[in-house]
């Protein structure tokens, strides 16, 4: 005799799509752009990995592409809310009129994830963060991204 089992499987990955904004703590400039990332959970309740890319555009005709890999510790706040704290390296490619540069930075974030249905299929996120660039000038910035979460089964 076979019994039906209800198995709540976690998604294989979660895609984050949204918008982003950044503010320089050194010179006060701001930039805005899109945000895309994929998150996986190699160690349940202990480690989530997020790889993402964010192109940011400023009024001064400069573009900054940030590509990061974050190591996050997750906490489940309720069936519909999660919090993660993470750190990781970031590659920064900057294009300004007459100049191009590549540099390495460090990033720290808090990631708030909200799942309205409780089934973790679609939701939304809000992720404030701090960046420290190790290149000459040691740029520091605060950023925030937010948008849609899509679970990949």
Language-model regions, residue ranges each:
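Outer-membrane beta-barrel domain signature
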Residues: 6-10, 21-28, 56-62, 95-101, ...
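Short glycine/serine/threonine-biased micro-segments
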Residues: 16, 20, 84-86, 127, ...
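Short amphipathic beta-strand and strand-loop transition segments with alternating hydrophobic
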Residues: 19-23, 91, 110, 130
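Short glycine/proline- and aromatic-enriched beta-strand/turn motifs that initiate or cap beta-hairpins
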Residues: 2-56, 141, 149-153
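Gram-negative (and chloroplast) outer-membrane scaffold detector with strong preference
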Residues: 37-122
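Transmembrane beta-barrel architecture of outer-membrane proteins
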Residues: 14-16, 31-33, 64-68, 103-107, ...
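Predominantly the C-terminal beta-signal and adjacent terminal strand-loop region
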Residues: 9-10, 46-49, 61, 111-153
């Amino acid at each position: 005799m076979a019994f039906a089992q209800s198995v709540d499987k976690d998604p294989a990955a979660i895609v984050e799509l949204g918008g982003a904004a950044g503010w320089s703590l050194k010179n006060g400039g701001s930039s805005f752009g899109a945000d895309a990332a994929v998150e996986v959970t190699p160690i349940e309740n202990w480690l989530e990995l997020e790889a993402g890319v964010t192109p940011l555009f400023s009024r001064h005709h400069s573009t900054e592409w940030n590509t990061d890999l974050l190591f996050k510790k997750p906490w489940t706040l309720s069936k519909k809310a999660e919090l993660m704290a993470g750190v990781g390296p970031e590659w920064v490619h900057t294009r300004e009129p007459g100049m191009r540069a590549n540099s390495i930075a460090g990033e720290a974030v808090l990631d708030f994830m909200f799942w309205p249905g409780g089934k973790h299929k679609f939701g939304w996120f809000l992720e404030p963060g701090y960046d420290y660039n190790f290149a000459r000038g040691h740029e520091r910035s605060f950023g925030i991204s937010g948008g849609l979460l899509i679970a990949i089964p």
